[in-house]
Structure formats: C-alpha cells, structure tokens
Amino acid sequence: MKKINQVGSLITGIIWVVVGVILDFVIQLGSTYSKVGIVNWLGVDKNHPIGIAVMLIVAAILTAITVWILSYAVKRKAPKTSLHPFRGDKLAWVGYGYAMILGAGMVTVALQYVFSHQKMTASNQVALEEMAKKGGAALVFVVVLAVFVAPLVEELIFRGIILNYFFKEGPWWFNVIISGVLFGYFHVYQDFQIFALIQYSLMGISLAVVYKKTKQIQYSIATHMLNNGIAALSLIGMAFGS
C-alpha cells in the first residue's frame, strides 16, 4: 500500500511539474505578446512606457495566478506552506545557499578548464545578456523575469513540488539531487551544454538544501532572488555600457 501511495505521489508530482512549466511559458509569452500587441495597436515605439506598463501588469497577473495554482499543489503535501515571519537562524541559510551557489560556479569553471581548457558561458545566459543589451522593454523584461518571476515560479516547481511529491520518504539527499538535475536540465534543454547542466544542477541542489534545512520555501525563494538580483546588476551594467 505504501509503495502504491509513493507511485501515486510521484505521478501526481510529475503532472504538477508539467503544469508548472507550461504556466511558466505562459507568463513569458503572455507578457511579451501583450506588449507587442499594445504597441502595434497604438502605433508607438516598442519601448514606449505604455507597452512596458502593459507587459508588467500582464506578467504580474499571470505570475500571481501561477503562484496561487502551484502553492495549492505544494500545500496538498505540505499544508504549512505559506509566508511566515523571517527568523534569523533560518535567514542565515540564504547566505549559506548563496555561498554554495558561488562555490558551484567555481567548481564548474574549474571543470571547464580541466576538460576543455576554456571557460564557456551557458547559452541561456548568453541569450539573457543579448536581450539585456537591447535596453528598454527587453531589459525590463529580463530583469523582472530573472529577479521576481523565476525565483517564485521555479522554486514552487523544483523545490515545492519535487521535494514534496518525489520520494519524500526516501533518503534525505535523493530528491535533493533529483530537484537539482531537473532544475539544471530545465535551463539547458533548448541548447544542451554539459558544463551548464552541471552548474545549474549544483545551483538547484544548493536551493534544495536551503529548503530542506529551513522547511520553508520562502528562504529558497529569497536565495534564488539574491543570486539572480546580483546577476541582474551586471546585465543592467551591460545594457547601459553598450
């Protein structure tokens, strides 16, 4: 009976992951095309403030709906999931998690030099940098997506759902690795690169450890936001420096 329940939980979790990924794409496409539609309808420049405002409003609405749906999924397995008052001892894990992510980046760079004798940038990162360099609406879209949308949605999918539906009763580390690898693959499947997979997977594992140690998803979300927020500063610098 226990094995049947575990299989049922796994299948349900897979369905929720697919739903989450689809909703993530809906946010990106919906916010992008809403901006394109309004600027074309008004006959104004693609970087017009009205277009950017519509894009942000649509992104906010779609993100709120997605967070509500995915939170419902997580709460079915972890009923106490919600925004709790931040505690100092648990907040420290945001710093630990960010340090682990930095360490993961260093390990990946070292592996690149050992096996390929050069440092390569993930295609996903290159695409974000190219969009950011365009400035205007593209820069706003990238920053909002990276700093706010991605941490909220991806943490609910890859930590909230996977760590609660996938082998929750198994060894502590087992679904942590699954969470990390699936998170990594999600970021490289369009243009697979082994070193990018390693880096994103290690980042995902770091975020999973934060969630498991604190038992509250707000801390892995905060860690994800911190990491992406700092990275976004360099994107903004590129945009204004180009």
Regions from the language model: what does each represent?
Residues 1-95, 99, 105, 109, ...:
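N-terminal, membrane-interfacial amphipathic/helix-forming hydrophobic leader that caps
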Residues 3-5, 17, 62, 77-78, ...:
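Short, functional N-terminal and low-complexity linear motifs
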Residues 42, 115-118, 170, 214:
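A broad structural signal for alpha-helix termini and local helix breaks/kinks
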Residues 55, 99-109, 119-126, 140-154:
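Charged, low-complexity, helix/coiled-coil-prone segments
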Residues 90-102, 130-142:
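Alpha-helical membrane-spanning segments of integral membrane proteins, especially the hydrophobic core
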Residues 114-136:
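Membrane-interface interhelical connector segments
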Residues 131, 135-242:
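Transmembrane helix-loop-helix hairpins at the membrane interface
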